[in-house]
Amino acid sequence: MNVFKTLKLFAVAIISVSMSCAVLANSSLNNLNTNSLKSAVALSPTAENKRKVERLLNTKTPYQIETGAVLKKVKYSKHFNMNVQMSSKTADKYSSDETDSLNRFVNEKIHPFYCSVFANAPVKPDLYVDIVDNQGKSFFGSAERYSDTCQ
């Protein structure tokens, strides 16, 4: 009986470590956080500088965050808006229960990028994420303050 208990604990430990590694290895949005983007964000948030941030990011869209999830467009006005197109299969992967829905995707994939981009910004905009299906119909939205998301 102790052998089975030990094997079970070992299996749980391996699964936990592999899931952690997968989360860290799959932070592809951070590839968009270039020195030119950091420089543009560090400037005062005038309309012109916000457009520059938009252009720097939108020239690289559509950008695959992971299989089935693509960053389609970024808009930076009063808030930092990200439009992500997601396949049903990928949405189902993240929607393990009804209450959390796609918050896990936003927490794992969007927050690290958002926090690193605006870490040195003089003004930190709120984050708005709109996840749309393949036809462009919104099925999940998230709105968060920098101070609540990035610590």
Located regions from the model:
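Sec/Tat signal peptide C-region and signal peptidase I cleavage site
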Residues: 21-25
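Generic alpha-helical secondary structure signal
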Residues: 47-51, 100
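Bacterial N-terminal signal peptides that target proteins for export
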Residues: 2-11
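Polar/charged, Gly/Pro-rich intrinsically disordered segments
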Residues: 26-42, 50-93, 119-151
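Short, non-transmembrane amphipathic alpha-helical segments
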Residues: 92-122
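Bacterial N-terminal signal peptides
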Residues: 10-18
